[in-house]
Each structure stands twice: as C-alpha cells, then as structure tokens.
Amino acid sequence: MTFSLPSGDLQTTCVNIMDGFFYMLGIFLVGFASVIISGLTYSFFYVILPMIQRANPHNPLWVSLHISFVAFLLINVLSNYFLCISAKHKGPLYDKVIRELAEATGFCHPETPQDVLQYKKDFEDRMIFRIQRRQARRVEARQEQQQVASSNSAETSGVTQRKTNGESTASNPANSTSIPQPQQKKPAMPVRRWLIMGPHEWGFCDTSHQPKPPRSHFDHVTKQLVLNMDHYCPWMFNTVGYFNYRYFCNFLLFTVIGMTYGASLTWYPFSAVRSKEYHDQITLSREQHSDEILHMYDYVPIPRERTAIAFSFLLCISVGLAVSVLFGFHTYLLLTAQTTIEFHGNCANRRRAKKMNKKYKNPYDLGMKRNFQQVYGSGNPLLAIIIPSNREPEFLPLPIPGKEGFRPRNVGKKGQEEDALVPNIV
C-alpha cells in the first residue's frame, strides 16, 4: 500500500481551517481568562479577605498589606494582559523600526514595487544557489560513504566453497553479502530558508510580498509579518513578538506570583473542609438554632464558602504549575536571546555542529545582562518589571553589540556594552 501527500489545494484548505480555528479559539480563551481572573478576585475579596480580617481583628496593617498586594498583582496582570493583546505588529511604528533596522544593518530597503520585485528575484537566486550547493555537498558525502562501504564489503566478502560428494558448490547467493540490496531513495526534506541564511541577513516573505527582516516570520493566524516572532498565543489572541514580548513575560511572572500567593492562602481552608473543626461549626450552629452557619475557627470555611475555596485552590495549583513551566522556559529564552522558533533551529544547528566536532554559539547572544536589556531596556530592571508601561522598545529587534544596537533616539543612553559576537556555523 502506498501513501501520497494531499494536493496543494487540499493542504492550503486544511491550513486555512486550522488558522480559523485558532483565531476563534483565541476569542474564547480571552473570555475564559477574564472569567478566571474575575472568579479569583471575587473569591479573595468576598471569602478569603473576611477570613483574614476575622483572624487578625487587632492588626489592620496586616489586612491592608494583603489588599495592597492583591491590588498590585491585579494591576500588573490586567495591564500587561491588555498591552499584550492590543500590541500591533504593523503600522507606523513597525515601519519606523524596519527603516531603523535596515539602516543599522546596511540594508538598502526597496521602496518602489519595481525595487521589491528585483530584490525578490535576487534573493530567490541566492537561495537556489545555496540549496543546490547544500544538496551537492550531501550527494558527495553520500557517495564517499558508499565507496567506503563497498570497499569494506569487497575485502570481507567472498565465495564460500562447499564440497559435497566430491563436487564444489557455491554458497547461496541470497546469503552473500557481496550483492547489494536495493535501497529505497528517501524523499528530500524541504529546507527552511531562514536556517541557511546569515544571522543578520534579510530575506523575502512570499506571503506578504515584502522584505523579511532578520528573526521575523509570517504568522498565518494574524496574517502579519512579525518581528522577532516567538509564537501565536491564543490566550493572548495575538502573536508574541518584538512589540509585546515584555508584556507577555511580565504577565507570566505576575500570574505565577499570584497563583502561588492564592494557593498559599487557600490550602489550609481547603484542607480544613474535612476537618473536625469544620463539622463542629455546623453542629454548634444548629444547636444554637442559628439561621446561618457561624464561623468559630480561624481559616475554617463554612459550607457556602466551600465551593469558592475549592475553586480557588485547585485553579491556583493547576494554572500555577502550568504557567510556571512556561515562565521558566521563556526566562531561559530571554536570557539566552532566543525565540521559541530560534530555539528549535539552534538545537538543529548544535546537532549539526557536533557531527563536525565543532561548537555552535547563538549569534544573537550578547550575554545575560544585555539580553535582558534587549527586552526590558537599559533602565532599572526592577522598575521595568513592576511598573506597567507601554513605552517603545529601546533596542533594535536584531541584537547588535555596542551603541549600534540602540534605536536612533536612544543612542548615548546608559547601557552600551561592547560584547562581541561569535560567528555561528552557516
């Protein structure tokens, strides 16, 4: 039985259906995230905060600290969530950054349609040459391996003579190793053009029909060419890239802090639901002929609070664990100057370099400090995280050492390190 890939039209239809699905999923998940945030906020102010007040009747400062901390978390979560959703990957600011990046990299950006067509032709010719050269090298390497294998086979193989009733017979040809077995030719794998381009090299986007800056990719869900594209996030209903990566990381950070804080507040009330104190409250309240179940123990909920406590605790634990893993991964990416797409490409480059007995280095890695500044700016790092701000990025999308990496309006500011790049393997 043979299998064949679907036709191009069918593949395009399937891709369009999946893109539409993820787009609609984003609308649902944004609403779902709003429900989660609203539910946890309600649980704190109407269930958990009264517990804290009853347990600390003579310590209003402690209660005020809890309220202030929750307000601080809410402001940062909501503001960064909104800024990440509303970030635009096109428009005047995008065009401005593109021109600044072209000037910094010495790229002559085509302005007229004729210039764009000419650049597209030149780029395609350059890519065809590189792909053909790469395929030729693979063919040469494969031929060398076959020659070595055939030479070894010829030295070790031979005809085995057997004598039966005085006659010499040859061994079974089926068992002879000298006869080469037919091998099915493996189909050539498609080559991603950005993997054979230089780290500072501009490309061309066949979908949006415009020059493609380094580190940029076309997002098929939002139909935009995104600078420093990391991934499309349906929870954000947007693509995470150059203009909103800071907001995305901040949202993950404060979500992890908020979920950890919420789990620490609700774990005892949640575990107390099965305790003796919980049932004693119900029994004593009924013995006193009270219309409602009374609170008689600190941080022990009553039946009508049980659902809110269970909802808050289980949600904080599950969401907190999931977001913690994601936040840890993106912290690693941020400090090593990688996007999620580049992370997978760098893994492939490391494997290729290892086969060549070489060591691969990410060409965008300027050191942890400068990598952090590429996203958060050269100002106070703590203030850059805890104070929500919609300021424009301070550095160019492409990490460049020294003052050349700053956008023109930021040249001369603090933080002009002179870290040197180590060229990668191309």
Region spans (language model):
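Membrane-associated feature with strongest affinity for ZDHHC
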Residues: T2-V426
